[in-house]
């Protein structure tokens, strides 16, 4: 395999056996074929590695050291190991639209001033049923908006691999590492968005209260660090108070059994035609043959780099 490809698709995973194969299948369904798939295990114990060890394609690298180091460390590892000029993010429980890489790559190549581009998303449940659309409005890159609302939809982000190497994720900000990265770089980075949903984001019906509260606590730490120089002390205090009120509202909503409703408010409801289109795309992805996962698919060699195994 050549040492250089146009795009590295990086998927960090931990205990994702139930969803990982579908995520991988969506990579093989891409209309752009000059990619490498970098699968980084973060100490799985559920057989996730065994589920993808069967992959037989020279564009795939499966890497694991047996340890649990956390998402930030694995994302930085992906950037360090990427052979591609461009790097596309993805999580192990999500699914890419077949045109995702092609369309993001076209934008980045057409306009070299753009550093990072994300896309709108379909949200879906655990059964891959489309639920709604999010992120189909233009980006607001003003510092206060970035502090208040975030910016990019993290698993859909694609950019030059060198950008990610220059701007690593900070492991101090667990569960909000993406928000910290966008805020840290918002005055020196140009962001863009494709407002067509090119990604399927898996979203549980109720979420997790403790995770949500932990995220908001981390966001308040980020606001205190970056807010004053960007928007001033007074505006920062208001943003911190807003975060506290959101935590109170979410805690109350959980007690009242309204978690699903709170989550659904983030989405735009799908029209009937959009539901049909989304289902058709997902069906096509699920029917995409993958060497090694499907007995009748072509089976070239795969590079594996796991403890005790030499690279192919």
Task: Enumerate the predicted regions with their spans.
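Glycine-rich, basic loop-to-helix element that forms the pyrophosphate-binding segment
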Residues: 65-82, 103
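Acidic helix N-cap motif at the loop->helix transition within catalytic regions
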Residues: 18-21, 46-54, 95, 99
């Amino acid at each position: 395999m050549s040492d250089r490809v146009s795009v590295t698709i990086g998927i960090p995973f931990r205990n994702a056996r139930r969803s990982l194969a579908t995520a991988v299948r969506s990579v093989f369904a891409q209309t752009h074929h000059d990619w490498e798939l970098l699968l980084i295990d973060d100490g799985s114990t559920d057989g996730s590695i065994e589920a993808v060890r069967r992959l037989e394609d020279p564009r795939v690298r499966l890497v694991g050291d047996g340890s649990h180091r956390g998402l930030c460390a694995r994302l930085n590892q992906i950037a360090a190991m990427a052979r591609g000029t461009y790097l596309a993010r993805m999580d192990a429980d999500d699914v890419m639209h077949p045109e995702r890489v092609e369309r993001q790559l076209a934008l980045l190549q057409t306009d070299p001033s753009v550093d990072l581009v994300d896309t709108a998303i379909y949200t879906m449940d655990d059964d891959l049923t489309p639920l709604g659309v999010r992120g189909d409005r233009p980006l607001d890159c003003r510092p206060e908006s970035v502090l208040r609302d975030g910016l990019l939809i993290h698993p859909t982000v694609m950019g030059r691999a060198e950008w990610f190497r220059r701007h690593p994720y900070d492991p101090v900000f667990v569960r909000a590492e993406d928000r910290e990265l966008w805020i840290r770089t918002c005055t020196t980075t140009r962001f863009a968005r494709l407002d067509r949903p090119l990604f399927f984001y898996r979203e549980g019906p109720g979420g997790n209260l403790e995770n949500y509260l932990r995220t908001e606590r981390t966001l308040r730490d980020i606001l205190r660090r970056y807010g004053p120089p960007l928007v001033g002390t007074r505006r920062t205090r208001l943003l911190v108070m807003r975060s506290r009120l959101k935590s109170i509202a979410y805690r109350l909503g959980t007690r009242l059994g309204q978690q699903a409703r709170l989550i659904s408010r983030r989405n735009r409801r799908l029209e009937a035609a959009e539901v049909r289109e989304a289902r058709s795309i997902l069906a096509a992805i699920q029917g995409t043959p993958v060497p090694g996962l499907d007995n009748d698919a072509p089976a070239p060699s795969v590079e594996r780099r796991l403890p005790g195994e030499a690279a192919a």
